[in-house]
């Protein structure tokens, strides 16, 4: 049985009083993870295909397999690149939520995944790729016109000034080892790192001739990924203006900006090895 709590709130006008009415049923027992009955099996030929099967009576699973989440009790999922993965299980039992996890290894890549070259440009797949400021530019960070400029063109901040802001030596690493991982190695902005999170890219063009898609980050950001004019709010959504083996150029409009030539911020990076 599931606990049910019903509150009936009765308020008298100008008085503000309320009377809670509570109806309870005793909850059932918590099923411990040691009692779970489930299997996670690699396909014997293509081990990037996983078969998930929960056979635990009266327990519902949610499976987080790094590339997505499924609430199907029996499902087939694909692990996109080789690596060691931790499958995280959130189980709803009669007495509450119980967590469990299992580690699996994948040795083959899903041939249908990450076919666009931009994924390799950005992350070098599972091996990872580290980016730093592009110090060959007059100013690799600053602001300019949204959907107009292709680099900082109003306030252009050079490497000396970036060092003065405490972000000149920061680094960020993208990789596809067990997920879409982004690690920011930061001295202080938005906080002292490393700050680990995830990322995704969408290669749908927003404005023809200006961008090539979008980059989204979760629980982390890029180097100096803040809106300086908006209380240093962390930026998690970027337009990709250029992405190849040697350059990554990003832009993000200030909150509320949608029109051409509104204020936007720009970031210009190069691979660390370059």
Where are these regions (language model features)?
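Solvent-exposed segments in extracellular or luminal domains encompassing
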Residues: 72-94
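Surface-exposed, flexible coil segments in extracellular/virion-facing regions
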Residues: 60-78
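Short, solvent-exposed loop/hinge segments that bridge or flank secondary-structure elements
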Residues: 133-178
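Bacterial Sec-dependent N-terminal signal peptides
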Residues: 1-40, 95-104, 108-122, 272-274
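Edge beta-strand at a domain terminus
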Residues: 194-202, 227, 245-274
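Short, exposed coil/turn segments at beta-strand boundaries within extracellular/luminal domains
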Residues: 69, 94-101, 260-262
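A short beta-strand segment in extracellular, disulfide-stabilized domains
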Residues: 46-56
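Contiguous, well-ordered beta-strand patches that form the walls/edges
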Residues: 160-243
């Amino acid at each position: 049985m599931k606990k049910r709590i019903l509150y009936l709130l009765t308020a008298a006008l100008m008085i503000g009083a309320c009377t809670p009415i509570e109806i309870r049923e005793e909850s059932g027992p918590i099923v411990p993870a040691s009692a779970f009955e489930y299997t996670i099996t690699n396909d014997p030929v293509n081990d990037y295909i996983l078969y998930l099967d929960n056979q635990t009576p009266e327990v519902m699973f949610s499976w987080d397999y790094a590339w997505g989440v499924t609430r199907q009790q029996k499902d087939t999922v694909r692990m996109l690149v080789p690596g060691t993965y931790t499958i995280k299980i959130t189980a709803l039992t009669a007495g509450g939520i119980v967590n469990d996890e299992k580690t699996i290894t994948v040795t083959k890549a899903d041939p249908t995944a990450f076919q666009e070259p931009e994924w390799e440009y950005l992350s070098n797949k599972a091996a990872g790729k580290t980016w730093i400021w592009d110090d060959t530019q007059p100013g690799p960070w600053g602001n300019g016109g949204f959907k107009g400029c292709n680099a900082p063109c109003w306030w252009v901040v050079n490497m000396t000034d970036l060092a003065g802001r405490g972000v000149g030596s920061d680094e960020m690493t993208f990789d596809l080892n067990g997920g879409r991982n982004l690690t920011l190695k930061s001295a202080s902005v938005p906080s002292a790192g490393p700050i680990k999170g995830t990322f995704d890219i969408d290669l749908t063009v927003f404005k023809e001739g200006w961008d090539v898609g979008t980059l989204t980050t979760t629980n982390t950001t890029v180097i100096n990924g803040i809106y300086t004019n908006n209380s240093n709010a962390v930026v998690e959504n970027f337009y990709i203006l250029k992405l190849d083996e040697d350059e990554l150029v990003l832009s993000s409009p200030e909150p509320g900006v949608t029109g051409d030539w509104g204020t936007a911020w720009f970031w210009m990076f190069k691979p660390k090895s370059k």
